[in-house]
Every structure is written in C-alpha cells, then in structure tokens.
C-alpha cells in the first residue's frame, strides 16, 4: 500500500535517503511504513520513493557549502536529545546563506537540499546517530508550512525536480 498522507510520504522518503546513505548493512528505524508503489485497488501510484530520494540526493549535491562543523553540532545535540531545534536552526541558517549567494534559488529548494546533505554528512560521520535524526528531519519538513506548500505546489513529492 502506498503512503497516503504527506507526512507518511515524507517519512518514507527520509528513511529511504538514510538507507541509501548508510548502505544495506544498517537497519533503519523501528517502525515499518508501507512504501510500495501500489494502491489498495492494485493501481500503480506515481509515488516511487526510490525516484524521489534520488531526485532529493541530486538536489542535495547542488549544495557545496561547508557542513562538517554543522554536522558535528547536530550529532552532539542529537546525543543530548536536542536534535530538533539545532537541526531547524542549522538548516535555516545554511539555506538563508545559500540563497543570499544565489538570488535565483528558491528558499524551499535550498531548505530541502541542505536537509538532505546534512543527513548525508551525519550518516557518514556517525551512522549510529543518523537514525535518531530521521524523526527530527521528518518533523521539520512536515511542520514547515512553506516547505509543505512548495512541495504540494509542485504537485507533490513525486513531481519535485532534483
């Protein structure tokens, strides 16, 4: 069954990204969401988590800012149980800085790119902590009205370009 809500889709996508970044040796999460691309009626849905995750990785690859210090800070705060606020502030700050350098860049695209790239850095630097960052990243995307409206304005996750 395909994820129905925006929130479920976001969770599937962030988990798929983490699986990509960590590789098959790591199990992701303790909650299994159905992320297949078939609906209850047997119709194939346009929601393909692998394609969407790939597009987001391409988007993230466009960000070439320095993330080492930010990732270390997110890792440290995640270990202390404070991932949510630090993650939001870090992504917001890096996204704003990137947009200031490139006036043609939509803030929402920068936000998504930085989120993906930061998750990739955390996964590479501290794989055991990366799983704890999935929920805060998912909540950050789901809870940001501007990001949500941007994605829905594109026609949903499945129409987001990399």
UniProtKB/Swiss-Prot annotation:
One of its GO terms (cellular component) is nucleus. The keyword rRNA-binding does not apply. This is Bcl-2-like protein 15. InterPro entries: Bcl-2-like_sf, BCL2L15. Keywords: Apoptosis. The gene is BCL2L15. Transmembrane segments: none annotated. Gene3D superfamilies: Blc2-like. The keyword Lipoprotein does not apply. GO terms for biological process: apoptotic process; regulation of apoptotic process.
């Amino acid at each position: 069954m395909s994820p129905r809500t925006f929130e479920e889709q976001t969770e599937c996508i962030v988990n798929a990204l983490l699986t990509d970044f960590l590789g098959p040796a790591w199990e992701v999460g303790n909650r299994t969401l159905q992320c297949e691309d078939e609906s209850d009626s047997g119709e194939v849905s346009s929601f393909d988590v692998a394609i969407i995750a790939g597009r987001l990785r391409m988007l993230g690859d466009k960000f070439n800012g320095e993330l080492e210090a930010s990732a270390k800070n997110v890792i440290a705060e995640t270990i202390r149980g404070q991932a949510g606020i630090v993650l939001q502030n870090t992504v917001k700050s890096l996204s704003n800085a990137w947009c200031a350098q490139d006036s043609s860049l939509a803030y929402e695209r920068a936000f998504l790119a930085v989120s993906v790239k930061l998750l990739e850095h955390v996964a590479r630097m501290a794989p055991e902590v990366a799983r704890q960052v999935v929920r805060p990243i998912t909540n950050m995307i789901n809870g940001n009205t501007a990001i949500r409206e941007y994605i829905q304005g594109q026609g949903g996750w499945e129409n987001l370009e990399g």
